[in-house]
């Protein structure tokens, strides 16, 4: 493990903002599908995968709004479909996270997702 050793007579001080982790964000956002009321998720990085999964949810009927650069508001109450088959799904490897949430809400799911070896599977 790496570490920093600071030698000297001046103590360190200040603030550091830590951005949310990409892999955690794309796993947490689909879980909103299971909610029966709007959710606000904070510390979400402003990256393309978050934008893609937001667009997927919007196409499924959710209302998604970025409140500021690190906060996402999602209202999943209008999602009426267990199908997530769009060009956005094809462009994102982590779209398989939608499977569990859709199965949990609708007891079935159809998600076209891209595996690293470029095989599309429909569940």
Predicted regions and their residues:
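Structural preference for solvent-exposed beta-strand-turn elements
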Residues: 1-123
């Amino acid at each position: 493990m790496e570490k920093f050793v600071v030698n000297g007579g001046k103590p360190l001080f200040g603030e550091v903002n830590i951005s949310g982790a990409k892999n955690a964000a794309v796993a947490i956002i689909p879980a909103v599908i299971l909610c029966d009321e709007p959710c606000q998720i904070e510390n979400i990085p402003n990256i393309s995968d978050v934008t893609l999964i937001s667009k997927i949810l919007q196409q499924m009927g959710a209302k998604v709004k970025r409140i500021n650069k690190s906060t996402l508001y999602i209202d999943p109450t209008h999602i009426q479909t267990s199908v997530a088959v769009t060009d956005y799904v094809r462009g994102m490897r982590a779209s398989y996270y939608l499977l569990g949430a859709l199965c949990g809400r609708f007891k079935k799911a159809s998600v076209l997702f891209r595996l690293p070896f470029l095989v599309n599977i429909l569940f």
